[in-house]
């Protein structure tokens, strides 16, 4: 196992992900993790991440100096390398010629860390400081046009000024793999088959004969959680799916069919009337979210009580992922709010369940791989993200059944055409928004005054930033024609070409 010490870089999670993609298990801890805790984890090597600070600043992030007493191989990346240089007596200073973006790395000295790596390759830089003078005992391994010391080595200690974890670094994955396998002696033992087998055994031991309540949204995380739990505890899993009437077209039926194929009993609650009655007359986005969250808890509580009376429920399953765990112990200290799974936060006191989080070690892409390992269909696993409040935040203004139906039909056409054109898997997320404006149109010889639909499609890697998708005009024309001809009450279709930032992906 490789342990990554986080100094606050936006790329830290990518380090662990790249290693895991190579079959090497990696964990992330804050830079101030105690040496005692590091020893308990028994890593075979340490990686010091990048970070936004300068090593010569008064408040610079610095780990315990005792990490060097562990006699472990260490790789410093960007700030991590500069910390190593500063600690061992070298000089780091503000760079007059800073490097951001792509640069050419040229290897000038053979090293095990560059085994099988091209002499010249593209790398990703992001630094304002640079190494001016190496400490005694360090050797230069590589350079870039503006960094004479772009990679350095001293015995089992290595430094890289660039970011090998970023996909733009052509040989970055190979370099990280070399450090883990050839320097640290790790083995490729990490994978979802191994994880599934281990986790099923662990869940059986932890839960025994107790009952577990799991809220299912129809999304990837909750479906994989339910599938994993069912493999472990069979019918002691109580999976609850709340239909709030704000789902995509045929969503309920698709979720039910999926769980039937997986042979997992699913308790479906039709709460459409309850939700829509409480949302009547509400147009403010945050109030919509609040009402949906509170109503979900009421409905979920009522259903939980029924099962609680039949046999005490001891556990509540949540789809916490590894990024949530990292966030809670970030370099800035514990977060004030830990994200909970779907709408399960704020449950009443009587529901004093123990939490069980089977996915807390996994990244999102690993959850999909685990789902595939467990037999969840690929089509289901690769579906686009869908917000917890559902179509409520894609209908601008007040919500009613007619608006929901219009949006469901338009959205289904858009998604269907994306799949026909083999575009669905090429965009990160696509959906329709029902605008709260009417516009004048002409159909036949008649004047119309009807709703407008907005098409939204974006490309992204994680949703933190996004750019609108460049869809062909002929494709957009086809979708527009179908929607205006097939969906009653729609006479205009527009395409959103806003990126994030300045806009958000969802409209509300």
Swiss-Prot record:
EC top class named in words: ligase
Keywords: ATP-binding, Glutamine amidotransferase, GMP biosynthesis, Ligase, Nucleotide-binding, Purine biosynthesis
Keyword flag Plastid: no
Reaction catalysed by this enzyme: XMP + L-glutamine + ATP + H2O = GMP + L-glutamate + AMP + diphosphate + 2 H(+)
UniProt keyword Transferase present: no
InterPro entries to which the protein is assigned, alphabetical: Class_I_gatase-like, GATASE, GMP_synth_C, GMP_synth_GATase, GMP_synthase, GMPS_ATP_PPase_dom, NAD/GMP_synthase, Rossmann-like_a/b/a_fold
GO molecular function: ATP binding; GMP synthase activity
EC number: 6.3.5.2
PROSITE patterns hit by this protein: GATASE_TYPE_1 (PS51273), GMPS_ATP_PPASE (PS51553)
GO CC annotation terms, alphabetical: cytosol
Disulphide-bonded residues: none
Stretches assigned to the GMPS ATP-PPase domain: 190-383
Domain Glutamine amidotransferase type-1: 1-189
Pathway: Purine metabolism; GMP biosynthesis; GMP from XMP (L-Gln route): step 1/1
Pfam families: GATase, GMP_synt_C, NAD_synthase
Active-site residues annotated for this sequence: 78, 163, 165
Binding site for ATP: 217-223
Alphabetized HAMAP family for the sequence: GMP_synthase (MF_00344)
Record's function text: Catalyzes the synthesis of GMP from XMP.
Subunit structure of this chain's protein: Homodimer.
Protein name: GMP synthase [glutamine-hydrolyzing]
């Amino acid at each position: 196992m490789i342990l990554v010490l986080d100094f606050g870089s936006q790329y830290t999670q990518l380090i662990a992900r790249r290693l895991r993609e190579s079959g090497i298990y990696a964990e992330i801890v804050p830079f101030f993790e105690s040496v005692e805790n590091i020893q308990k984890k028994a890593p075979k090597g340490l990686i010091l991440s990048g970070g936004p600070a300068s090593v010569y600043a008064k408040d610079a992030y610095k780990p315990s100096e005792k990490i060097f007493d562990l006699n472990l191989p260490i790789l410093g990346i960007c700030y991590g390398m500069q910390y190593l240089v500063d600690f061992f007596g070298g000089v780091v200073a503000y760079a007059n010629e800073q490097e951001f973006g792509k640069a050419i790395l040229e290897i000038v000295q053979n090293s095990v860390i560059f085994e099988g790596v091209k002499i010249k390759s593209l790398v990703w830089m992001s630094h304002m400081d640079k190494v001016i003078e190496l400490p005694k005992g360090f050797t230069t391994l590589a350079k870039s046009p503006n960094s004479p010391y772009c990679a350095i080595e001293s015995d089992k200690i290595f430094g890289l000024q660039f970011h090998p974890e970023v996909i733009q670094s052509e040989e970055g994955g190979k370099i990280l793999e070399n450090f883990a396998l050839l320097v640290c002696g790790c083995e490729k033992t990490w994978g979802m088959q191994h994880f599934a087998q281990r986790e099923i055994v662990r869940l059986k031991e932890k839960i025994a004969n107790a009952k577990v309540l799991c809220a299912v949204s129809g999304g990837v995380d909750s479906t994989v959680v339910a599938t994993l739990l069912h493999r472990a505890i069979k019918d002691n899993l109580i999976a609850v799916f709340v239909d709030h009437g704000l789902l995509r077209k045929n969503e309920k039926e698709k979720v039910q069919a999926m769980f039937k194929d997986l042979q997992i009993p699913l308790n479906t609650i039709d709460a459409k009337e309850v939700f829509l009655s409480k949302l009547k007359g509400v147009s403010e986005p945050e109030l919509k979210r609040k009402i949906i969250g509170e109503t979900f808890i009421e409905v979920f509580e009522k259903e939980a009580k029924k099962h609680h009376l039949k046999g005490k429920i001891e556990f509540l399953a949540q789809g916490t992922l590894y990024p949530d765990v990292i966030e809670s112990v970030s370099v800035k200290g514990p977060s004030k709010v830990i994200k909970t799974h779907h709408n399960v936060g704020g449950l009443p006191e009587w529901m004093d369940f123990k939490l069980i989080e089977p996915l807390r070690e996994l990244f999102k892409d690993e959850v999909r791989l685990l789902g595939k390992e467990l037999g969840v269909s690929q089509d289901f696993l690769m579906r686009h993200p869908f917000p917890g409040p559902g179509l409520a935040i894609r209908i601008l203004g007040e919500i009613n059944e007619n608006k929901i139906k219009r949006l469901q039909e338009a959205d289904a056409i858009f998604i269907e055409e994306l799949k026909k054109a083999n575009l669905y898997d090429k965009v990160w997320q696509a959906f329709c928004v029902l605008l709260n404006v009417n516009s004048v149109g002409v159909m036949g010889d008649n004047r119309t005054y009807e709703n407008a639909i907005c098409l939204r499609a974006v490309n992204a890697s994680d949703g933190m930033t996004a750019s609108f998708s460049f869809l062909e005009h002929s494709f957009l024309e086809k979708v527009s024609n179908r929607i205006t001809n097939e969906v009653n009450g729609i006479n205009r279709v527009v395409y959103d070409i806003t990126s994030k930032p300045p806009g958000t992906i969802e409209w509300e």
